[in-house]
Amino acid sequence: MSVLVTGGAGYLGSQLVLALRDEGENVVVLDNLSTGYEWAVPRGAELVIGDVGDRLLLNHLMRTRRVDAVLHLAGALVVVDSVADPLGYYLNHSIKTRELIAAAVANGVEHIVLSSSTAIYGHPAENPVPETAPLEPLTPYAVFKASAERMLAEAGASYGLKSVSLRTGHIAGADPSGRVGHAIVGATDLVKIVLEAALGRREYVPVFGTDYDTPDGTGIRDYVHVADAADAHLAALAHLRAGGDSLTVNCGYGQGHSVLEVIDAVQRIAGKVLDVRARARRADDIVSLVADPHRILKTLAWQPRFSNLETILEHALAWEARAAMRAA
């Protein structure tokens, strides 16, 4: 039997495929390489370059590779792109996810793990936010994640498909052994930007919003190490294979860090003072979003290994430094 990983050549995907291979799993990666890289797919995993919405290809892979589970990570991570072209985003993500789920049902695939996002909560009324909180997706990216969760729930009710949706916080860090890391061109996430500035690849670090109702006036997020996020997907797969029911769980540490806290930590680790420039708030930016981890810790026995912010940033900085040397 094999595991099909969509988006397995990307940031989280490549880390997950490494973890699956370390567990001895047969892995098929389906990726169009729009934000992924062939070199990021580890030895022993099969890379198929193709589209997650290609029904004929999906049918072929699921039958010939004897796929028993799908880990669905495909999807662009740059949220501003989803805002710039929402209809195109829905076509490339929501509609194609429907094709993936339909192919799984048609070919007898019993388990799907969805990489969802805490972004679907929007502006939560409480932090840490539990899974029972109302959903308020504010961007096409978040709408896509919420709709994918809904499609899986309905497929479960109608066809018996079992699934786990992992609402993950802001993924950061890199493989602790330095095998893979964040390599997406044009990425806009805070950690990537701050580390590039620390390595002299950016002139300054913009801070969008310094007047929020938080201790230092900047936004707060739950940063999750990419290796811990990969482990959560493995735990979700093990849960389903053991006959567990469908679940929706947060994947986070229950502790948030502000923008300025991240910048200060990078300055300490890198030993540099960065040029930090205040900017106006961006539309629909969330003030504070921290995931309540109680359900995932209880139901999936997930045991995060790298929850310390400085550890996350040290691994990420080591990766970025090596990437800069390779590019020189």
Please state what every model-predicted region is.
Residues 90, 138-146, 180-192, 222-223:
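Short-chain dehydrogenase/reductase
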Residues 1-174:
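N-terminal Rossmann-like NAD(P)+-binding domain of SDR-like oxidoreductases, especially those catalyzing
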Residues 176-179, 218-219:
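Short acidic, glycine/proline-rich loop/turn micro-motifs
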Residues 191, 199-328:
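C-terminal substrate-binding subdomain of Rossmann-fold SDR/epimerase-dehydratase oxidoreductases
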Residues 50, 183-187, 255, 305:
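Residue-level signature of the cytosolic catalytic core of signaling kinases
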Residues 13-14, 79, 97, 148, ...:
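Alpha-helical structural signal
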